[in-house]
């Protein structure tokens, strides 16, 4: 999913650094609201991965809880979550059909084996081939009730004139990975409203 941001935001972001772009993206309420709606629209166990805990992960989890609390179990996992609690969540999700895990890339891209992940949402842009493939690998585990994995790779189009923004370039790198791995994918442009 390629999110085209409003023109006034693009104008403000056109000369910003990578760090400033990531700050804008991770704290953008409209973007996070879109992600929370996407989570609510999916069936099956959903893993939402984000990079910044305080800036994005926690506020995004709160939005998801507000939207989904009536019919889904929602778990927040990041570096400070004790190993025993992570294992409890893993066990609960294996037994659940419609749970949501909101986690940091660092805690869930490697070393966690949950077979019943039906959807993965990359809520933060990432470029590392190893981390991208390891994150996708969380959902490629075989489970009896799962025929496919839906990956929602959220990218942000803040390009101005002929200049692509940093995170859109990173999306291009992830597309190269998807092509190398021969994944089926579709790029869907979406216009964010203010």
Regions found by a protein language model. Give the residues of each.
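Conserved interdomain hinge at the start of the Helicase C-terminal
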Residues: 2-4, 8-69
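Long, largely alpha-helical accessory region at the distal end of helicase-like NTP-driven motors
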Residues: 41, 45-46, 183-194
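Conserved RecA-like helicase motor-core motifs
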Residues: 47, 65-87
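Short, flexible loop segments at the rims of nucleotide/cofactor-binding pockets, characterized by
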Residues: 22-28, 76-80, 98
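Short coil/turn segments at beta-strand junctions that form active-site/ligand-binding loops
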Residues: 44-45, 72-73, 97-99
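Conserved RecA-like P-loop NTPase helicase motor core
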Residues: 79-180
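Hydrophobic/aromatic beta-strand patches that form the interior of the parallel beta-sheet core
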Residues: 1-2, 75, 121, 152, ...
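Short, conserved beta-strand edge motifs with alternating hydrophobic and charged residues
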Residues: 2-4, 47-51, 75-79, 101-104
